[in-house]
Amino acid sequence: MVTIRLSRGGAKKRPFYQIVVADSRSPRDGRFIERIGFFNPIATGNAERLRLDVAKVDAWVAKGASLSDRVAVLVKEARKAA
């Protein structure tokens, strides 16, 4: 099954997440099919907090991909901001 989920990057105590399309059997930070955005939970000032290609999310969901709980909230936030 294909899922759209967060893949953690960044330094210790400073998380940065890529939003990726990946096989659900792959490790969290392992192999992915496509990178469709990022999420920076500790963005400050003018730093961009969320960038997400909503068209690609819609395309993958149409193909049968499922969203993780956190990504579903982020997609809703991105649609509201756009």
Curated annotation (Swiss-Prot):
Pfam family, one: Ribosomal_S16
Protein name according to UniProt: Small ribosomal subunit protein bS16
Gene Ontology MF, one: structural constituent of ribosome
Record keyword Protein biosynthesis present: no
Keywords of this entry: Ribonucleoprotein, Ribosomal protein
SUPFAM superfamilies: Ribosomal protein S16
Family: Belongs to the bacterial ribosomal protein bS16 family.
GO CC aspect terms: cytoplasm; small ribosomal subunit
Highest taxon in the source lineage: Bacteria
GO biological process, one term: translation
Gene name of the encoded protein: rpsP
